[in-house]
């Protein structure tokens, strides 16, 4: 597991402050978490291939390329620890679903994918603190 990394101010204010703690903004908060995760992924030098890719099976939050590896990324954002760490909500069933989704995406590709991996990124926002990112590579 990677140590949480602080994110740039451009995505942490004021939009983030406006979304914290407001139940009616859950979809917007999730999208904001995905924005932060995408910024983090790009800071690693990876290329975002797709965001919110959907098919009949479901949705993949982010698909990125890390050199010769295509990485399918599940993003979870939380505004506190009342329901646990963001990554704790990724169940075995969700991981199976991510594998199905990755296969569905790969079936339609013809650009010579060499390897694939499924990662998880948790975004935590605590009151009065900068958001942090936790990245787990190769979830199973």
Curated annotation (Swiss-Prot):
Q: Which family does it belong to?
A: Belongs to the UPF0102 family.
UniProt xrefs under Gene3D superfamilies: 3.40.1350.10
Q: Which InterPro entries match?
A: Restrct_endonuc-II-like, tRNA_endonuc-like_dom_sf, UPF0102_YraN-like
Report the source organism.
Cutibacterium acnes (strain DSM 16379 / KPA171202) (Propionibacterium acnes)
Database matches in PANTHER family: UPF0102 PROTEIN YRAN
**CDD domains per the UniProt record, alphabetical:** PoNe_Nuclease
Q: Name one GO molecular function term.
A: nucleic acid binding
User: Where is the organism placed in the taxonomic lineage, from the top?
Assistant: Bacteria, Bacillati, Actinomycetota, Actinomycetes, Propionibacteriales
Q: SUPFAM superfamilies recorded for this chain?
A: Restriction endonuclease-like
Name it: UPF0102 protein PPA1431
Q: Which Pfam families match?
A: UPF0102
